[in-house]
Amino acid sequence: MPRKKPFSVKQKKKQLQDKRERKRGLQDGLRSSSNSRSGSRERREEQTDTSDGESVTHHIRRLNQQPSQGLGPRGYDPNRYRLHFERDSREEVERRKRAAREQVLQPVSAEVLELDIREVYQPGSVLDFPRRPPWSYEMSKEQLMSQEERSFQDYLGKIHGAYSSEKLSYFEHNLETWRQLWRVLEMSDIVLLITDIRHPVVNFPPALYEYVTGELGLALVLVLNKVDLAPPALVVAWKHYFHQHYPQLHVVLFTSFPRDPRTPQDPSSVLKKSRRRGRGWTRALGPEQLLRACEAITVGKVDLSSWREKIARDVAGATWGNGSGEEEEEEDGPAVLVEQQTDSAMEPTGPTRERYKDGVVTIGCVGFPNVGKSSLINGLVGRKVVSVSRTPGHTRYFQTYFLTPSVKLCDCPGLIFPSLLPRQLQVLAGIYPIAQIQEPYTAVGYLASRIPVQALLHLRHPEAEDPSAEHPWCAWDICEAWAEKRGYKTAKAARNDVYRAANSLLRLAVDGRLSLCFHPPGYSEQKGTWESHPETTELVVLQGRVGPAGDEEEEEEEELSSSCEEEGEEDRDADEEGEGDEETPTSAPGSSLAGRNPYALLGEDEC
């Protein structure tokens, strides 16, 4: 080992002076947002992020940065699959902040909540997804990687050339993550596209449907996940909408956290966390439907009897566990073989491969971040085998899980496809990490104009002297009122911390506690028809049969009521720290507005 060289005090002083000079130079021009928390985050990112030298990726924001001292012992880079989105300019961020302070919120009509997929993705336009370019076995790995890089840059150039940044939504700019999708599609016999029932057209890119069913010739199963967060009539309406527009789809309803929609919500426990214990994962709604869909696709080419037997065992075990009152450990179930795929698995396997090789059906699970892909796998297995998180981008690389000896599941990292969605809606859909949003106030305004946030949370206008008087609300007022109600204060000046309050409101929306559900076209006119539809009644009965049966316990902390609930996982977002130990507002007893909503009103006196 070489001898350490002495480092004098004079040298150390010079080193610190140089470091201060470098920081001072990097911070020039960023004074406009120097007093805000989001401004300091933006400065840190601009100091650390470097462009790749390509014009289309010049303003890319890299999220979920992990500390790294170079490659690990196995050559693994923890930042290889982090989310890459286009960066908002400082001028655009400041403009949205001013609008959040000045624009008075007006409630929108029910027709505004109707989303048509043709308006979101514009099928036939350049809003496609990158395809793996043609290749041959004569090409070296370096040649193939270089060709894929050039093809990906051309793909980005076409999109940014056809649409301005203001019209485009956030979408994935990381080629490494798209390569994961290519590999999963190549190795799959059946593709599951998981969507969130609250906004399924947001998570359903028609280009992927055309590619899977057309070019690849594979069966595509659409999973409408988290059906516990939407009214049963709306779930059935969305199911028929996709059947009508995409006849080759197999549609399956799923939730890992079923609840009986006929049971009134207890207003005093809506915002308390229900922690699943024992065999809670075995009560998932949907495994039987998915099995029937796979049987219809494979038509006897694969023996799926072991899967049916497993579902029967899970149901019997859950019933026995609930009846006996004994708590079962999740680890008591049979072992699940897990394969973590390395770079060697990313090598091309050839233009074609044998379908149902060795009598095993491979089911690929793809979808947007935060739609519950990992929770779906846990629900199918019957216990927790995949860690889940509210933070988008939690799944870093694809893994395979043998559900039975003849059924293999493949979990792909979440991918954001390009679209024309409002970016505020993407934030509310959980696509963008909330803790890293530069400006969360307009997303709060988007939410408050579609559901009565002020009334639901019993907020008092910050400028109101008379509580009974009507005052116009803007997004900033809502955040300030929530900060006052929750006691969110800044560290030094003890002012209302509106940034933390905005993040808190967005988390309530993403978790489903403030539930914003979008409708298919024409739903408002035909709502009565869907409510009396036979499939709606059947879904209500089915949810009631598999709903909670005493295997949950409430804790004095905030509840995660969506299907992407964290089980023993702490949210790694910085702004989440400390929120779980605070008092949660509850509704006053006998509140006349408490109904079967997934969220309930919070009482004035009990906050």
From Swiss-Prot:
The keyword GTP-binding applies. Residues 15-26 have a biased composition (Basic and acidic residues). One of its GO terms (molecular function) is GTP binding. InterPro entries: G_CP_dom (IPR030378), GNL1-like (IPR043358), GTP-bd (IPR006073), P-loop_NTPase (IPR027417). Residues 1-14 have a biased composition (Basic residues). Keywords: GTP-binding, Nucleotide-binding, Phosphoprotein. Residues 1-81, 547-607 are annotated as: Disordered. GTP binds at residues 225-228, 367-374, 411-415. The modification Phosphoserine is found at S32, S33, S34, S51, S68, S324, S561, S562, S563. SUPFAM superfamilies: P-loop containing nucleoside triphosphate hydrolases (SSF52540). CDD domains: HSR1_MMR1 (cd01857). The modification Phosphothreonine is found at T48, T50. Residues 550-584 have a biased composition (Acidic residues). Possible regulatory or functional link with the histocompatibility cluster. Belongs to the TRAFAC class YlqF/YawG GTPase family. In contrast to other GTP-binding proteins, this family is characterized by a circular permutation of the GTPase motifs described by a G4-G1-G3 pattern. PANTHER family: GUANINE NUCLEOTIDE-BINDING PROTEIN-LIKE 1, LARGE SUBUNIT GTPASE 1 HOMOLOG-RELATED. This is Guanine nucleotide-binding protein-like 1. The lineage of its organism: Eukaryota, Metazoa, Chordata, Craniata, Vertebrata. The gene is GNL1.
